[in-house]
């Protein structure tokens, strides 16, 4: 009897890539994917603990899965950042968890499972060669019916931002060999992906030299059957400038800049142990729009960091008004144990953080409404992601999968992965309605 697994993925696209590394490992060891958690013999939860709300979601997901386990007599496996950060807590407080391991072992998941449960090895597993060979063509994609894939170029981070806990459990920056990146990209494309998103904690740190970074991106873009290449997590510095210029020279690279600024106040950036300042960020955004016509920008800000004053929030408001980024993500600062930020006096109340976030969000929504108005009647290059509630879910090249806007089109004949043009007809607060043309 073959043993089935299911992977629940929490957190960011980097976790999706890690989950698919596990997926591939489990297939190689003879396990079969299940369609639903309750149908699996082994339910993996790939966890997130980047901020407090992510930790709370992880705990709730584990506890809910523990209830399913009791009803279905399955094994519960907790992996990733939460398991790396809180192994003692899992061991002592969540006895329903049968196995847990941290980051860095995703590609060994199948072997770890067989070692933990020796009764599975090897006679209890049915090695379905045709299934295995088909899935060996796959890469790190969360759902193989989707026309996009995430490929990790590195893990860990050397930046040392004072608010970030990630280096404590992901470790120092460690890049993937170029051959591995190309292999994973080709596997994903053969599995049906039209779009590849390169992800990491710090993409521009790759190679520690801008020419090595640019060479890696060029070689991925040169893969013949790749339609769209999207670059994610670009730290705002000089190497990002060079990447932006490469975007302008390379048609396959999506017209999209994701660069998380986290703040624009020089005072707060210094306390965060981050480089840059408002005028440099403005120049960076202007350069991107200049060299890549039609490009749209996604950035993020952490609100309520220790020492933040109303005038620092005003700087963010002015920056957004001046640069008009199309996509803005706002995080309420939550001190993470083990970071330098947690050692600072917490000067902003939760109520005040919410007030400031709402102020910034409302201001950006006014700008976004004007941006939406300018999109009406315009036609964009787009890709079909799937069908949902009787409509095609279409995504402009200016929007990243799973985190940006989509366009709903009344045409269920559109197949996932189809690339063409969509005209924008109307909009909601974020998403849009359109016509495939």
UniProtKB/Swiss-Prot annotation:
Keywords from the named record: 4Fe-4S, Cytoplasm, Iron, Iron-sulfur, Metal-binding, S-adenosyl-L-methionine, Transferase
The protein's required cofactors: [4Fe-4S] cluster
UniProt keyword Cell membrane present: no
Catalytic activity: L-aspartate(89)-[ribosomal protein uS12]-hydrogen + (sulfur carrier)-SH + AH2 + 2 S-adenosyl-L-methionine = 3-methylsulfanyl-L-aspartate(89)-[ribosomal protein uS12]-hydrogen + (sulfur carrier)-H + 5'-deoxyadenosine + L-methionine + A + S-adenosyl-L-homocysteine + 2 H(+)
Entry-linked CDD domains: Radical_SAM (cd01335)
Gene3D superfamilies registered for this protein in UniProt: Methylthiotransferase, N-terminal domain (3.40.50.12160), Nucleic acid-binding proteins (2.40.50.140), tm_1862 like domain (3.80.30.20)
Residue ranges occupied by any TRAM domain in the UniProt entry: 373-437
Pfam families to which the protein is assigned, alphabetical: Radical_SAM (PF04055), TRAM_2 (PF18693), UPF0004 (PF00919)
CC per GO annotation: cytosol
GO molecular function: 4 iron, 4 sulfur cluster binding; aspartic acid methylthiotransferase activity; metal ion binding; protein methylthiotransferase activity
The enzyme's E.C. designation: 2.8.4.4
Alphabetical GO biological process terms: tRNA modification
Residues involved in [4Fe-4S] cluster 2 binding: 157, 161, 164
Sequence ranges assigned to domain MTTase N-terminal in this UniProt record: 3-118
Enzyme class: transferase
Localization, UniProt: Cytoplasm
Known role: Catalyzes the methylthiolation of an aspartic acid residue of ribosomal protein uS12.
Protein's recorded name: Ribosomal protein uS12 methylthiotransferase RimO
Organism: Leptospira interrogans serogroup Icterohaemorrhagiae serovar copenhageni (strain Fiocruz L1-130)
